[in-house]
């Protein structure tokens, strides 16, 4: 028997079997039908608070679906760039919202009129073009402000970098009697520029913004500043620069320079010193600083207990 005949036989039998199945009907007396809704005006009333009323010029007070051309504000004009430059961000947002809302109203009226085959909508389009000009000028004003901010930030960064370079030179070359004064300045500098709190605590570490990209930059600056000062005063010290990223920079932030140099040498000798990937830096610093602080707290608590005894 061919494959075709098998398929035909199967199909025929399935139809036959389907026909011989008895039809089942439920008890129709148990089916309850809902009474038909009588057409009334109340059934077509729309809530006065319905959000789609925003697409009508007078909201829920609107009486007609499409305004006449004479009802449009044809004498209006678009906002000028000079006027918009004097507005705050909040005012620009309000103007943009009102402009967009009016454009939506006009668009609804034009689309509805065209679908009904109604007449000329040139006046509607003229008003819409004025609104489009206002929106374009708002975008231009916002772009001008963004560019101004970026230029100011770039200038400020240049000034900050110049100050940091100058402070580094003075710190490295300061006299012995000036070290304490420069150390206090460094504490203020790291807080003002890099946001590194001099009273860093375990509670502050729980805040996600405590250790950020700016903190990492400050850590690098402080570590290199301290090690260069130490090497200038102790040229016989055998220590190679540059430091290999946060892994070698952190000891100079947490300890005295001599202790930090010893720790970095141990890291290098053991092969544990490596350059971290960007995604590893902040979690590493947070965990390492937290571990160091907990260790200091434990040591401090132990010493207090010993003194009491």
UniProtKB/Swiss-Prot annotation:
Q: What does this protein do?
A: Component of the mitochondrial ribosome (mitoribosome), a dedicated translation machinery responsible for the synthesis of mitochondrial genome-encoded proteins, including at least some of the essential transmembrane subunits of the mitochondrial respiratory chain. The mitoribosomes are attached to the mitochondrial inner membrane and translation products are cotranslationally integrated into the membrane.
Q: Which GO terms describe its molecular function?
A: structural constituent of ribosome
The yes or no answer to whether the keyword Ribosomal protein is present is yes
Could you list this entry's UniProt keywords, alphabetically sorted: Mitochondrion, Ribonucleoprotein, Ribosomal protein, Transit peptide
Q: Does the keyword Magnesium apply?
A: no
Note the SS bond partners.
none
Mind telling me what this protein is named?
A: Large ribosomal subunit protein uL29m
Species, as recorded: Candida albicans (strain SC5314 / ATCC MYA-2876) (Yeast)
